[in-house]
Structures are given as structure tokens and as C-alpha cells.
Amino acid sequence: MNGKEGFAVWITGIPASGKSAITRELVARMNSQGLSAAVLESDVLRTILTPEPTFSSKERDHFYLQMALFGAMLARQGIPVIFDATANRRAYRDHARTLIPCFVEVFVSCTVDICRERDPKGIYAAAARGAASNVPGMQAVYEPPLNPEVTVDCREAPLINAEKIFTQIMALRYI
């Protein structure tokens, strides 16, 4: 690892693009090398930080600020961090980058049509029924990264995408 500081990988993409599957494979790849990481999964943290989420812009601003701060605290302790979170605004991810010097942004490129077909949590179906009104990539804006360190295709296997990310982490000498 690069000095005492940990590093962070923020895996972003619209809902159902495969972020969590890629995260699981990246953790497994790191574990295979004797490395561990703290995974900050937005779905899990949201149940703690916003138990009754509205997904409003104001709530998202606050939530992603907290998430970035948690990640920075861990990274300062030398703990690698993997963010598994849509973070629909660039500003959320850019803020984390300012807090964590060793930072890798990963964009999971995926069309809304593919995500709508996958829809494991039913959020696109809920949006179609009018029951969800803030789905990133549909009613809410999703701002893809301008210059991510890694871009992966959601149609590729999560294992292949995780290997691309791991290779970039190694190339940057974060591990």
C-alpha cells in the first residue's frame, strides 16, 4: 500500500448496473491476495443514516457527504475502502476524491434498458407505476464520471470487471 494512507474505489453507475456484483468480486480478488477492504454499500448505510428515505436531493446531498466522510476516516487509518453506491451527482464522488488522495473512480456503463430488464429491487417497475419518482437515470439525473480511472461494461462478467479494477489499483501502486 502507498504509505500509511488507505485508498478508495468508488464504483458508480445507475441502479441495477451491477455495482454490487462487481464489488463482491473485487473484494474476493483482494482477499485472494491477503488484502481486506471496508465496503461502504449505500443500500446498507441508508438503512442506518436515513431509515425512512425519501431520496430527495437534499437527503442525497447529506447522505453522500456522510458516506464520503466515513470512507475518508477509514482510508486515513490505512483501510482500503470500496464504495458501492450510485452517487448520482459528480459532486458527491468529486467530494470523496478531495478527501481521499488515493482514489479510483469506476464507472459501470449500462443502459437504462438493460437495468430495467435486471431490476432486482423492482425500482424501475415502481417508477413505471409512479410509485418511485427519484430513480437516477430516469426521473432523477445521473451524471456519469467525466474522467474515471476505470470504465467497465455491465454486459461483461463481474469477475472480468473486478479484475480490470484490481489491475488499475496495482498500476497506481495503491497496493
Language-model regions: role of each:
Residues M1-A8:
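Extreme N-terminal, non-catalytic leader segments
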Residues I11:
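Hydrophobic anchor at the beta1->P-loop junction of P-loop NTPases
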Residues P15:
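The conserved Walker
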Residues K19:
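Conserved lysine of the Walker
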Residues R24-A72, R76:
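Conserved substrate/cofactor phosphate-moiety recognition/catalytic segment
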Residues K58-V104, V108, Y124-A127:
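Glycine-rich phosphate-binding loop used to anchor ATP phosphates in small-molecule kinases
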Residues E117-K164, L172-I175:
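Small-molecule kinase domains that catalyze NTP-dependent phosphoryl transfer to phosphate-bearing small molecules
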